[in-house]
């Protein structure tokens, strides 16, 4: 029911704004800065670095944290690309051939279909699935931190892993 939330806001005479995509952009920038631009030799090092991010650390304890979906922890990671974090679910399955040609050896995304996994494996790309809710939590936390700085009270709910930075 796409109209459930807007209709509830209207009944409650509350304003409503959807910040999902901007928050996805925030987590993509966060991961680029903290993971993609770092030097890692092996895939397990990338997984360990992700596991030190509080939202992912908590998600891991819940059984929904970052995991390797394609490849091996002992593989060289090569260049890292943050993919499928923002802009919808999945792009074209043909992107893996282009990513491999560009020297990308490891991708990090929120989720991945079996078709995409097969294409990643075909082109020897390691695929780390960071997790949807934990990744969303990073982005929304970065946004909420800014609201709190402006004096807006934040009450976490709906599965948000609230971490203040």
Predicted regions and their residues:
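Non-catalytic interface/targeting segments
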Residues: 1-109, 114-115, 119, 125-165
